[in-house]
């Protein structure tokens, strides 16, 4: 929120806010749609983080509406990189797929 507010105070016309897929309800139907936002209970284990991300997303929307800024929110889900978790049962989607592709190639 501080970065968004500072950007607005300093005349920044464009901003990209990074959200998270955790802003959607715990039991959102799949495939998930943007319209699911705020329709039911969030996952309790990351609710505070999700609420902070929802606040940022909404703040960008309000500034756009009221002041004509071009602040967008994107949800960069399924990213991977250095130090990612490639555990066979406890990893995210992309690292799990990379591991499985590698194992399939190695094992024929």
Question: Which residues are covered by each model-predicted region?
Answer:
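NAD(P)-dependent short-chain dehydrogenase/reductase
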Residues: 27-36, 61-108
